[in-house]
Structure formats: structure tokens, C-alpha cells
Amino acid sequence: MQKKLSRWAEEDPAKRFTDLYSLLCNETWLRVAQLHVNANRGRETAGVDRRTMSNFLGNLDGNIERLRETLKAKTFEPMPVRRVYIPKANGKLRPLGIPTIDDRIVQEALRMILEPIWESDFSIHSYGFRPNRSTYDAISYIGNRLTGKGWTFQWVIEGDITSYFDTIR
């Protein structure tokens, strides 16, 4: 289905996708999303509800059905994230928000729906949080541009936005 979504988005950039919510409520789609979340090494990190993936798997069928029903009834509400702080190399602490397992599964299901559609709209020069792209790809591209024939640059600007994610509301 993701390949179809991607193909439709590429073939018709003006296409309106009108029934994506039914995918989100699809049991198989939620099961695949759960498998993706389960493959993450943070699967045993609990959110504010104190449930881990092991807890979720203890009643997998019931939990998937419960999630599906709340999504279908449009009564699903994400929980607050659990805030933890991890040490950074400079000695400061970096805040992390840990979603519940339910929220992670729904977020992954949404990513699985939206990513193939939006990918065709993104710039080929965008590397952050993109499938099959990494910081190494971005560095390689920049290196090739800086050393390639016919290209001359007068400036290279390096930047870092301090505590950027802390300022997003």
C-alpha cells in the first residue's frame, strides 16, 4: 500500500487523498506499525502509563483491537509524554519525551501513511529524518559540491541552534 501511495503522489502532485483515516483504523496496518515499534531498542521504555512493549504484547490482539476501536470511533487521545533527562557530552542534560506504547504505534502508523505521500514533495537536497538518507549523505553531497569542477564558493557557514527543540511549543 505504501508503494501505491507513493506512486499516486508522484503521478499526480495535485492529488487529494481523501480516505487515509481508514488506513489508520486498519487492523493489519496497526499490527505492522506495532512490529516496527517492537523492533526499536526503546520498546521496553515505559511512557506515563508505565506500560512497556512486553505489557502490550501480553494482550496483543486485545490491545490492537482496543486501539483500532478508539481510532475508528475518533475517541483516541494521545497521552502526555514522560519527561526524562539524559546527560550530554558537555555535562548538560538533554530532555527527552517518552510517548506511551499506544502513542508510538499510532505515530508509526501515521508515518507509514504520510511518508510515502510527502516524500515526492520534499527537496532532493533535504536529508533530515528522511528514509534512505543520513547525515553522511548530506556531508558527501556538500563535499562533492565544494570540490567539484566549476563550483567556487566564497563562504561556508556552520551553525548550531542552541536548545532548538526546547523552544518549540
Regions found by a protein language model. Name each.
Residues 44-52, 97-98, 136-169:
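Conserved catalytic palm subdomain of right-hand nucleotidyl-transferase polymerases, strongest
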Residues 41-56, 78-105, 121-134, 157-158:
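Short, conserved non-catalytic motifs in the polymerase core
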Residues 12-15, 19, 28, 32, ...:
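Generic recognition of stable, solvent-exposed alpha-helical segments in well-folded globular domains
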Residues 31-37, 69-92, 101, 105-114, ...:
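Reverse-transcriptase-like RNA-dependent polymerase core
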Residues 1-62:
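Non-catalytic, polymerase-adjacent accessory regions of viral genome-replication enzymes
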Residues 10, 23, 100, 128, ...:
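Hydrophobic alpha-helical scaffolding
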Residues 114-120:
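Short helix-interrupting loop/turn segments at helix-coil junctions
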